[in-house]
Amino acid sequence: MNVAPALRRIVIAVTVLLLAPPAGAQSHLESRNRWARLCEIRRDKFDRVLPEAMRENGIDMWIVPMREGDYDPLWNLLGRGYVGSIGYFVFTDRGGDRIERVAIDITDHNRAACGAYDIVPGTGDLAAFVRARNPKKIGINTSDEMGMADGLSHTLHRHLVTTLGPELSAKMVSADKLISDFSSRRVASELVAFGDATEIGRQIAERALSNEVITPGVTTLADVAWWIQEQQLQRGLGSSFEVPSVYITGPDGIEATSNDRIIQRGDIIMMDFGVGYLNMWTDQKRMAYVLKTGETRLPASIQRAFDQAVKVREVIRKTARAGKTAKAMMDEVTAAISAAGFTQMQGFNQVRNDASTEFIIGCHSVGDWGHGIGPSMAWFNPGRLNFEIRPTNLFSIELFAYTPLPEWGGRKLRIPLEDDAVVTSRGVEWLSPINHRVQLIR
């Protein structure tokens, strides 16, 4: 009997069984898991946040047009999809406890399964759709202050005016405050996702500033930046600010950033970067010192400078809370820091020639972008100082503290601290372990 053919068939059958995906394997696909989490976030945002954001701003219809190759900055937040010539996301307050949400001429084969949008047949005619709902005010994405809320191009604006006609287009108003509120007021599923993002970012940052990556006298700043980007690529993450800022600080300030400067013993290294995960974008900093030959611990002067910065951060943590405008809270925070014995800086990097520790804060909105569009206690976001801080707003708690170093002839070392948090009625609450130390590279 010739057993070879039978044996061959058995081998083939076993191989097929071994290579076949197990039953239910699709439920473990990372792409599907991320999609499911984003759907949950979108449903929660549309159900919980969008009604109050539209009603508080007096807008009963919000139209977000886009076309292929010209996607609005809110494309990810609203659910993406394929757009041919022109498509629209349209949100209408028709009363009750929910907002009608419709995608017109934006294709997504998973939209029904996601469940965030209403499936309204025959919605290809935008003008007829809008006339049937007869809104009082139509919000559009234009803004002088916030680029993320300014996605409507001149051509698409002209198209809207022509398509809707003079009577309806006269009702168009800027939706920038609506967009800010919708983006920055968080639901629980977002807070979980953002906590995951900050923890991922923390782990990458702390590994980057260690001997795992850095060999003194060999590794360049660019090597560290590329290592970070490789980690992001391998883990399917975005980058909040493209190339991470990995820089050396000296008596005259920043000496080199993410370039071919070789890291040497005695260097003080700072890093500023962010990761993108599940449409959540972080903004985080870490710091390291490269021990000189014979050193076993951080020099006392640098430790004191770091400790001073930590004290400033602790005042922010204890003082900042929801319930006031960002300007009122910023004034309260800076007064509390000054009362704790620190000197408020007159302007960013405008250092006094004295023995004081100076500070400046830039606690800004974060989340849908590395620099978000919610209320901000930051000198570089003046248009958002009048926005009220609401519970669940995400903030990057950013500060700079400048302390004299004796070995620098009294010139000041700038210590930047930045970790991401949620601000509640109780105060600042961290979402992952924050920076409590200067890392040592041996």
Predicted regions located by residue number:
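Bacterial N-terminal signal peptides that target proteins for export
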Residues: 1-11
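A general, composition-driven signal for non-globular sequence regions
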Residues: 2-3, 15, 28, 307
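Sec-dependent N-terminal signal peptides
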Residues: 10-18
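N-terminal signal peptide c-region/cleavage motif recognized by signal peptidases
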Residues: 20-22
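Active-site neighborhoods and metal-handling regions in enzymes and metal-associated proteins
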Residues: 26-442
